[in-house]
């Protein structure tokens, strides 16, 4: 996202959020120029989200529009602009478990503050539509792997959790995650946020308040 008009809209949205709430701001904007990221930082942006998608050794089988190095540079540009970063990937795209380990260490080496875990939901007609959905215990092992490699960051489970973990989603927390993304996702629907809150309350957990989030930044 490097269109000037679109950039100005995002900057204005960030300014309003910072002025009217006590929320932290995070944007997911794709491949960005360093100067534009600096403008967003000056507007009040706290964090930039950018996924590596998959391991470097598997990347060319999944992405053809740009390189793995472009993904890494996007994260590093955000850091150069003074932003925290949120870096994750999508699991279940035909990669081996060793390639998940590879991705985990690549994310660790970038120094991310948080990591979103997405599980592929194969969609007919797409390049990965022929793949099988990642198995339940394989998903839990992947969460545990990421927690082992990255013991101190925020690790949250996002797209695909409803399909992969079904009615046992609460186990993602015992596997090592400490958060979830609620609502709908980029191309798929999520479950009712009220159901998420009920699950969290049943586990005796409590989401942090915005004051607690900001005080720990």
Residues covered by each model-derived region:
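Core AdoMet radical
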Residues: 1-74, 84-87, 113-118
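Short Asp/Glu-rich motifs
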Residues: 4-6, 36-37, 59-60, 96-99, ...
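Alpha-helix N-cap and loop-to-helix initiation/capping positions
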Residues: 5-9, 63-70, 95-102, 130-138
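Generic structural signal for well-ordered alpha-helices
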Residues: 10-15, 37, 72-75, 104, ...
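Hydrophobic positions in alpha-helices of CheY-like receiver
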Residues: 13-17, 78, 146, 150
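Auxiliary Fe-S-binding modules of radical SAM enzymes
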Residues: 21, 105-217
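Catalytic cores of alpha/beta
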Residues: 32-43, 92-108, 162-175
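Short, catalytically relevant binding-site loops at active-site mouths
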Residues: 91-95, 121-124
């Amino acid at each position: 996202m490097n269109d000037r008009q679109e950039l100005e809209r995002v900057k204005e949205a960030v300014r309003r959020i910072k002025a009217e709430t006590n929320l932290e701001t995070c944007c997911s904007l794709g491949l960005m120029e360093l100067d534009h990221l600096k403008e967003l930082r000056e507007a009040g942006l706290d964090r930039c989200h950018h996924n590596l998608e998959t391991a470097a050794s598997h990347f060319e089988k999944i992405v053809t529009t740009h390189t793995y190095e472009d993904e890494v540079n996007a994260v590093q540009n955000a850091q150069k602009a003074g932003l925290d970063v949120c870096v994750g990937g999508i699991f279940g795209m035909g990669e081996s478990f060793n390639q998940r380990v590879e991705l985990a260490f690549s994310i660790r080496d970038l120094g991310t503050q948080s990591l979103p875990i997405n599980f592929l939901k194969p969609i007919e007609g797409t390049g990965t539509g022929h793949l099988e959905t990642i198995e339940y215990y394989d998903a839990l092992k992947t969460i545990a792997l990421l927690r082992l490699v990255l013991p101190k960051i925020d690790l949250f489970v996002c797209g695909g959790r409803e399909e992969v973990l079904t009615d046992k989603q609460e186990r993602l927390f015992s596997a090592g995650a400490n958060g979830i993304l609620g609502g709908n996702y980029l191309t798929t629907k999520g479950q009712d946020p009220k159901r998420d809150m009920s699950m969290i309350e049943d586990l005796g957990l409590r989401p942090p308040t915005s004051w607690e989030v900001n005080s720990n930044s």
